Each structure stands twice: as structure tokens, then as C-alpha cells.
Amino acid sequence: MLNYTGLENKNVLVVGLAKSGYEAAKLLSKLGANVTVNDGKDLSQDAHAKDLESMGISVVSGSHPLTLLDKNPIIVKNPGIPYTVSIIDEAVKRGLKILTEVELSYLISEAPIIAVTGTNGKTTVTSLIGDMFKKSRLTGRLSGNIGYVASKVAQEVKPTDYLVTELSSFQLLGIEKYKPHIAIITNIYSAHLDYHENLENYQNAKKQIYKNQTEEDYLICNYHQRQVIESEELKAKTLYFSTQQEVDGIYIKDGFIVYKGVRIINTEDLVLPGEHNLENILAAVLACILAGVPIKAIIDSLTTFSGIEHRLQYVGTNRTNKYYNDSKATNTLATQFALNSFNQPIIWLCGGLDRGNEFDELIPYMENVRAMVVFGQTKAKFAKLGNSQGKSVIEANNVEDAVDKVQDIIEPNDVVLLSPACASWDQYSTFEERGEKFIERFRAHLPSY
């Protein structure tokens, strides 16, 4: 829907190109605005910048001249650019309106919105909601921080579709009228304080997600963080999720996901592992129920959805052994979540780039580790760690060799977990490449029939 006229003949300055700035500039031009794009990087050889210039859009790059503010433009800010950047700081002082392209997505689309934010879990929740829609006859288009520019997707959705948008705290700061029908706050912990300066500012940024909601809308949030999340501004109907007790919303009871007293699915039938993922699942299920997704489609998704690639991703089963790819676990905190996600014996594949870290903080999470296959620059450190805890330790050359060596020690019902707790750059260009090598080697060991 491009009949929105609120920006026609208005001066608009897009600060920061990247994907979102590029799409926002094109959209603003279609809406009749006088658009200028500004980026601190030199864009003289940038293909997107040249494309915009061919459309008659002015591109100023290499610095942030404050003279760009002299025509009192509306600012559309790339979410990654902090408010301390000179041109944004000056725009604030002058009282200029500052938006993000997520606000534009709301202005041009009549589709109802499911918006997801939170410190952890938002990508998993957004992806799971998208998968549940896909299993039904309804359409839910993913957008936002998950990699699909919201203002581009908003031009493609029908009023009968849902726009399912992952929002970072950076994007939420640019909200003026944005109003999701269903808002989800997965959790709020301390994060991005370099951008927000303090925890209170960060929390307030997250709360922007519901500031325009009315009594006809829904907020879904963690029951055990309700005091952090809720405020006097909240007008939406609030529903909760909890893995610990019955709440007004959705919860776990006697091993089942329960909504309004009705059992939906046994948690043992879920493919996605981990207590933290149980919370993500509850939030996604509740949102989809409210959006009218059939229970059958929700169950189909929960029994097949294997997670985000390289984030505790279920790869497959060989005989009785499940394999999980958690290559994105490049620090000990992420690996703590992974090790804590299984009750079965674990063969843990770990190691990678040596940044001078010690790994003793993982000891409390190693109870279910039966054996370790270690590789990379930190191989010796992990071998020492395993030996100190009486674990069986095998050394490998790399991830592929580690999967091969697993075959010599694996026992029925063992879980094979790649969760390196280290960056990949000692042996692989990216954590994605490392994860793909793990998956390829797993498949090579599958029996051929």
C-alpha cells in the first residue's frame, strides 16, 4: 500500500546506507519525498549508492556535514548508528524528527503486526512463528532484525497477511506511531550499554514496543520479569508465559504445554532443546494462537522445527544419537546454555581460536558430559579441563576429524554436541563454515540403505 501521503514533498535525510537505508531511500522516493542519503563511509564506488543516484536521490558520503540539517529534514536513521554521532546529536538538539525504517513499514502497510523483541531469544521466536504460519494456510512474512528489511517486506504483504517483525532496541528508539497487534518481549537483561549508556535507557527502549498499543492489542511477556517489563504506559491486554507455574497465558504443567487448561503438546515431543528454548516456544505458540494459526499447524512446527542455523541446531539422528550444531557458541556463556540443555549423556566437541581465555567457568555445566573431543588452538586447554573433571578426552585435528573420532566412542542415546566456546578463525573463516563442516561430516556417517 503506497497511497500514504504524509511524506510527499517533505525533505528527508537518510543517515546510514546499508540494506535498511537503501530500501528506505527507495521507498521514500516512491512516496514523493525529497530524499538525501548520508553515510560516513566513502560510497563513491558503492553499487547501491550509484543505484540511488540513478533514481535522482542525492548521496553525500565520507563525512556527516551538519549543513544537511539546514532544510529541517525528517531524519530516517539506520538503527546501528548511535545518537552520539555528530549529525544525529545535532538533529536532536534542533528538535528534528528522527525515525527508523521500521516506522516507515508501519505507515505504508495495513497488515497486522506481530513484533518480537528481547535481549535473548528474539530470532528463535520470530523464526518459529514464521514456521508455524508456514505450516498453516495463513501468511506470516518475516522482517526486521532477522535479515529482511521491514520497509521492503511491508510493500509486499497483503492486509490479510501478518507482518512478523524482529526488533532490536536500536530500532525501537525510532518509533512514533508504530503499533503491533501482538507484541512479544522475551526477556530483558543488561545489554548494549555502550549504545544506551545505562540499563534504564535500554529497558525503556524495549518498552517502546507497546507504547502505542490499545486495549484491542496484546503484549506477551515473561511472567517472572513482569515488574521489569510493565509500566504505566501499558494499555494492551497482557498475557504471560512461564515454565514454572500456571499463569494467565501459557505455561508448562506436568510435562505439557498448556493454554487455557488445554494440553497442546508433550514437551518430550519438542525438537528444539533447552530450558531457554522452552520459554521461546511458549511465546511463539501463544502469539500464533492469538493470530488464529490452527493448533495442528503449531504442533506440526514444534515437532519439526530444528532451530536457527548454527544455534543449537538439530542436525539429525544417526541410529539412537541426536547431533546438534551450536557453532555460533563462540563464548563460554553460549556453551553454558548448550550444555545445560540436555539430560542425556553428551559427547562434547569443543575448541577453536585461543584468545587467552580459561574455561573453568564451564565446570558446573559439565555434569552430563561423558566424553570430550577437542580441536583447534585451545585443544590443550580443553583437554586439561576434561581431565580435571575425570572426563574421557580425545584430541582431533579439526571439526571433521572430531566427528570421525566420535564414531569410535559413541554409545546408545548419547547426544553429540558441537558447542566450541571459541571463535572459528584459527581453522575456519566463519562459524557458519565450521558448522557446515560438522553437518557434512555427520551426513557422511549416515548408513546408506
UniProtKB/Swiss-Prot annotation:
Which residues bind ATP per the record?
G118, T119, N120, G121, K122, T123, T124
Which transformation does this protein catalyse, written as a reaction?
UDP-N-acetyl-alpha-D-muramoyl-L-alanine + D-glutamate + ATP = UDP-N-acetyl-alpha-D-muramoyl-L-alanyl-D-glutamate + ADP + phosphate + H(+)
Keyword flag Zinc: no
| Top-rank EC class of the record's enzyme | ligase
Cellular component terms, GO, for this chain's entry?
cytoplasm
So, what pathway does this thing act in? Cell wall biogenesis; peptidoglycan biosynthesis
Q: One short Pfam family name for this protein?
A: MurD-like_N
Give a short account of what the protein does: Cell wall formation. Catalyzes the addition of glutamate to the nucleotide precursor UDP-N-acetylmuramoyl-L-alanine (UMA).
The gene from which this protein is expressed is murD
Its protein name is UDP-N-acetylmuramoylalanine--D-glutamate ligase
Subcellular location as annotated: Cytoplasm
What GO MF terms are annotated? ATP binding; UDP-N-acetylmuramoylalanine-D-glutamate ligase activity
Q: Which domain of life is it from?
A: Bacteria
Q: Belongs to which family?
A: Belongs to the MurCDEF family.
EC number, UniProt record: 6.3.2.9
Its BP terms in the Gene Ontology are: cell division; cell wall organization; peptidoglycan biosynthetic process; regulation of cell shape
Record organism: Staphylococcus aureus (strain MRSA252)
Kindly give the PANTHER family that the UniProt entry links to this protein.
UDP-N-ACETYLMURAMOYLALANINE--D-GLUTAMATE LIGASE
**Keyword field:** ATP-binding, Cell cycle, Cell division, Cell shape, Cell wall biogenesis/degradation, Cytoplasm, Ligase, Nucleotide-binding, Peptidoglycan synthesis
